[in-house]
């Protein structure tokens, strides 16, 4: 393999990784604005642009996962998670816990994700 082919392959691979990392649950909405509407994706309307489907929409994938934690968890400090995570499911906490602090769980599934719900707190 030549060096230029390897560099091109590496560039394409990194581009795919960056697309997956920085994409959001956008549905068919692309990055286009008023001057870029035909080239990105439609922002409002039925979801189809004049040149076909919006080709630059976010990934918006879905998955099923279970997380189980057992044992003693000595945790101190605070954690903050910001951003949009397309998750539909339930949160459950069971068992005895000696804890001080507060927990806030809030979420929303906006109309771009397909279910059109409003935030709940």
Swiss-Prot record:
Q: Where is this region: Left arm?
A: 24-57
Q: Which GO terms describe its cellular component?
A: egg chorion
- The segment annotated Central domain runs over 58-105
Q: According to the UniProt record, where is the region Right arm? A: 106-121
InterPro entries to which the protein is assigned, alphabetical: Chorion (IPR002635)
Pfam families, from UniProt? Answer: Chorion_1
Q: Which domain of life is it from?
A: Eukaryota
The signal sequence is 1-23
An example Gene Ontology molecular-function term = structural constituent of egg chorion
SS bond list = none
Per the entry, what this protein does is:
This protein is one of many from the eggshell of the silk moth.
Please give the family membership noted in the entry. Answer: Belongs to the chorion protein family.
The protein's name is: Chorion class CA protein ERA.4
> What species was this sequence derived from?
Bombyx mori (Silk moth)
């Amino acid at each position: 393999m030549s060096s230029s082919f390897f560099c091109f392959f590496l560039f394409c691979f990194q581009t795919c990784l960056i697309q997956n990392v920085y994409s959001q649950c956008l549905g068919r909405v692309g990055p286009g604005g008023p001057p870029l509407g035909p080239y990105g994706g439609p922002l409002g309307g039925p979801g189809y642009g004049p040149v076909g489907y919006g080709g630059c929409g976010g990934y918006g994938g879905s998955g099923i996962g279970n997380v189980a934690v057992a044992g003693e968890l000595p945790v101190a400090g605070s954690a903050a998670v910001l951003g949009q995570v397309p998750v539909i499911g339930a949160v459950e906490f069971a068992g005895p816990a000696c804890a001080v602090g507060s927990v806030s769980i809030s979420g929303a599934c906006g109309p771009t994700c397909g279910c059109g719900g409003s935030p709940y707190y």
